[in-house]
């Protein structure tokens, strides 16, 4: 069996010393910078393994952001709130003092750099969001997936989507961030990450609805919404180069057609229960057609260029079960229609309900955590800018040197078929 979720590489970055020398006029200032160096290095290392403990990685992530807050905003009191838009927070005087270099998930050969601490903060939040999606995949890949694992998978995807949204909303802080096509700050790429996390969270809900045997109409509608979100994600990447983005796009396309197949399958089942056999025949035939396209996309995905994991979703039980399900429904609809109903089979494709009013995945809004207790007005004032080298205020630019890719641990995936009725490991 193969992974159900495609995953792009984690962002690489250059080691940061936080060596501000004469700017640090007190032991507390030096301690903050020394701790930032250690915490950053540990956090970046944690991102290499998707199976690391969620609570531990989240704690390390929040502690780093809290300690880093004084490099983002002026510390006016020990209880300053970074997210309070009405508090009149000013940018920190420390923003331009350190140069940060980060790579991009989809452009392994292109690193960007700038002397701006918001570049560091937003890049780190992106990294955490990417790790959360990978952790979700590791939860879905266990030999035995319990309900708590499925909930953690859903939680991670919702949190990741909220973080991606936060980065997109705050990216206007960075001059030139959106000028590097295909970078992680390209608006098209950021929106694709948001939509992909949303669609994959929706997948968990669809699987749960199937497993719990909810109303066929509801399942059809949820699957149709999921297909629509995957399609929107794919369309965001329309004009980006195939050599970097083809594999990601084929993944989004196969998921789009796969969930259309499920939507038509359950629409057909609903119509059968309502004695609308002619319409059920048409829905099942359309579902079979969509499944055929999904298989074609899976084959194209296998040879597509671009970074990231190479998965085989067509070998997954959840994928394999849809074809016999459609065939059973079609055979029953045709048989009953031939014997009893004699209804005309419509030529037009049935309309799917994409207006589901409940059961939809909502992203968890991300809020930057408050500054660490180490920060107060006296500590902030003790960073002496008169001792700093002249900052570089230029906008983000491509780095002349490359960054090595992150050597990530392989995400474990069970070889066992799920024992549940839906065939989905995340139900």
Curated annotation (Swiss-Prot):
It comes from Caenorhabditis elegans. This is BRO1 domain-containing protein BROX homolog. Belongs to the BROX family. Pfam families: BRO1. Residues 1-427 form the BRO1 domain. It comes from the Eukaryota. Coiled coil: none annotated.
């Amino acid at each position: 069996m193969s992974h159900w979720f495609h995953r792009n590489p984690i962002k690489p970055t250059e080691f940061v010393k936080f060596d501000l020398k004469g700017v640090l006029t007190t032991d507390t200032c030096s301690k903050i910078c020394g701790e930032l160096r250690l915490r950053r290095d540990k956090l970046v290392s944690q991102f290499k393994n998707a199976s690391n403990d969620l609570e531990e990685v989240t704690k390390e992530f929040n502690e780093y952001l809290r300690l880093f807050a004084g490099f983002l905003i002026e510390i006016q009191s020990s209880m300053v709130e970074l997210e309070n838009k009405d508090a009149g927070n000013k940018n920190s005087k420390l923003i331009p003092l350190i140069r940060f270099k980060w790579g991009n998930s989809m452009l392994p050969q292109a690193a960007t750099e700038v002397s701006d601490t918001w570049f560091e903060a937003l890049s780190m939040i992106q990294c955490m969001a990417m790790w959360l999606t990978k952790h979700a995949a590791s939860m879905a890949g266990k030999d035995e997936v319990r309900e708590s694992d499925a909930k953690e998978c859903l939680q991670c995807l919702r949190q990741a989507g909220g973080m991606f949204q936060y980065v997109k909303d705050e990216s206007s802080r960075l001059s030139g961030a959106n000028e590097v096509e295909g970078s992680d700050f390209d608006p098209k790429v950021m929106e694709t990450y948001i939509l992909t996390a949303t669609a994959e969270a929706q997948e968990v809900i669809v699987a749960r609805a199937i497993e719990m045997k909810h109303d066929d109409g509801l399942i059809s509608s949820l699957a149709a919404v999921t297909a629509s979100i995957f399609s929107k994600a794919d369309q965001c990447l329309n004009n980006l180069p195939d050599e970097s983005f083809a594999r990601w796009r084929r993944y989004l396309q196969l998921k789009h057609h796969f969930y259309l197949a499920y939507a038509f399958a359950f629409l057909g089942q609903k119509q059968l229960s309502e004695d609308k056999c002619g319409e059920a025949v048409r829905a099942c035939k359309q579902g079979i057609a969509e499944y055929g396209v999904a298989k074609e996309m899976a084959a194209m995905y296998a040879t597509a260029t671009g970074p990231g994991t190479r998965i085989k979703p067509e070998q997954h039980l959840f994928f394999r079960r849809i074809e016999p399900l459609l065939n059973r429904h079609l055979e029953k609809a045709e048989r009953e229609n031939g014997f009893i109903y004699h209804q005309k089979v419509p030529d037009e494709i049935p309309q799917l309900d994409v207006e589901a009013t409940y059961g939809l995945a909502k992203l968890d809004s991300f809020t930057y955590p408050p500054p660490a207790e180490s920060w107060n007005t006296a500590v902030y004032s003790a960073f002496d800018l008169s001792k700093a080298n002249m900052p570089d205020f230029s906008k983000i630019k491509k780095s002349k040197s490359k960054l090595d890719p992150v050597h990530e641990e392989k995400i474990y995936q069970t070889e066992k078929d799920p024992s549940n009725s839906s065939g989905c490991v995340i139900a």
